[in-house]
Amino acid sequence: MAIRRIEGLLHLASEGRYAILVGRFNSFVVEHLLEGAIDTLKRHGVNEDNITVIHAPGAWELPIVAKKLATSNQFDAIIALGAVIRGSTPHFDFVAGECAKGLGVVALESSLPVINGVLTTDSIEQAIERSGTKAGNKGSEAALTAIEMVNLLKAI
């Protein structure tokens, strides 16, 4: 008997329904992440009618909105995008940590892929680099992960 392998593939994703949840705070970075995610989904065959963009105030609010989206049974995956940039107070640590933890809890409780595309950077320059310049576009990478996870969960 052979070992069975199950993988999520990056093939055309025309059937999937994707929610892109965007924190508006640091919008000068987040808008580029959103553009990258939408472009990647469309290039992989996702119809615009199967993409819904939801704007939340910031990264702190993303988990509760993700939970509402997950329980709506309208989506195959949620892509959470935002940017938390370190400042001179511990606020960064609380927001970044609780956002990541909350998104993970939503994914586990709902069995729905909730992709964490929230940047956590030490500087504005790092955030800009990760939103489409030197370090690629993390919004695009999050969309690829969402496609792969939708396909993987369907294959299991």
UniProtKB/Swiss-Prot annotation:
Please tell me whether the keyword Aminoacyl-tRNA synthetase is annotated for this protein.
no
Q: Which reaction does it catalyse?
A: (2S)-2-hydroxy-3-oxobutyl phosphate + 5-amino-6-(D-ribitylamino)uracil = 6,7-dimethyl-8-(1-D-ribityl)lumazine + phosphate + 2 H2O + H(+)
Pathway annotation from the record: Cofactor biosynthesis; riboflavin biosynthesis; riboflavin from 2-hydroxy-3-oxobutyl phosphate and 5-amino-6-(D-ribitylamino)uracil: step 1/2
UniProt entry keywords in alphabetical sequence: Riboflavin biosynthesis, Transferase
CDD domains associated with the record: Lumazine_synthase-I
Which InterPro entries does this chain map to?
A: LS (IPR034964), LS/RS (IPR002180), LS/RS_sf (IPR036467)
Oligomeric form and interacting partners? Forms an icosahedral capsid composed of 60 subunits, arranged as a dodecamer of pentamers.
Name by which UniProt lists this protein: 6,7-dimethyl-8-ribityllumazine synthase
